[in-house]
Amino acid sequence: MLKNLFYICLLLLFCNKSEAQNLSSIIDSCHYYLEKQDAMSFNKTYIRILDAYEKEYDAELYSIEEELKEMRIEDQSIRLLLLDASKKKQNVNKIRRIMDDIDRRNAVRVAEIIDQYGWLSPDDIGYEANEALFLCIQHSQDSLIQNKYLPILKEAVRDGAAKGWQYAFLTDRCLMNQGQKQIYGTQRITRDGVDYLVPLQDIDKVDSLRKEIGLEPLSEYMKDCGLKTGWSKEFYKNNIKQHESIFNSWFQSFKRNKNSY
């Protein structure tokens, strides 16, 4: 409790009474509840101080954070809907078209944000908004956008503004969308309800590369993806021609769809 009071006092020292009326009213309420010994109301109120402070004193970043959080909700919600539609075999193409529109719009906006502010860290905008930067670039169908921001993401990882696994996923996605073999084994293709790994550059080195970037072994990843049958390096090596054929077919379809936009 004393620690909370200390932070409240700090905010009071730095806040101008002519500004931040909302913040000021929240702080006044905290003092009122303390005097009334209303611990429940105090606990519900003091945790609103940081949000109010950011909204009033970092209004620009606060607005960006809220916008990115909304884009993250869009990005993930439409994918959950597509997953359900695929299971039910209902409205899949309609939902996919909606998802593509969302992805294009979000990628363009996130590109604008990164160009203006750089790759904002969780300390700048919170974890959800920070994740939205990655998701919207990752899910873009525009290879130019993905390739442009891949080195920026790499720098963000180095600076602690993004996660290593995000760099691995975007690296593999960029390669996949160019018809090339992936490095980290993060990308899969689903055909008739069966997952196939996009061909790898080096199956024997993939686990050590994944470990360097903070990812679990590939066999564990494939298991977590919900494969009904076991997966192993030997399985992959024995079926590499099938994986390559399925990937080549996917890539040709991807190029046709891309050219139709």
Identify the role of each PLM range.
Residues E112-D123, A129-Q187:
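Extended amphipathic alpha-helical interaction segments
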Residues M1-I26, Y261:
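Bacterial Sec-dependent N-terminal signal peptides
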Residues Q21-A129, I137-L144:
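Preference for long, solvent-exposed alpha-helical segments and helix-linker "stalks"
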Residues Q90, D101, R105, Q116-W119, ...:
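Surface-exposed, polar/charged faces of alpha-helical domains
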Residues K181-R210, Y221-D224:
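Betabetaalpha-Me/HNH-type nuclease active-site subdomain
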Residues I26, N106-R109, Y149, D202-L209:
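Stable alpha-helical elements in mature extracytoplasmic
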Residues K205-Y261:
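A cross-kingdom marker for long, charged
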Residues D38, F42, E56, R105, ...:
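Surface-exposed, interaction-prone regions with an acidic/low-complexity signature
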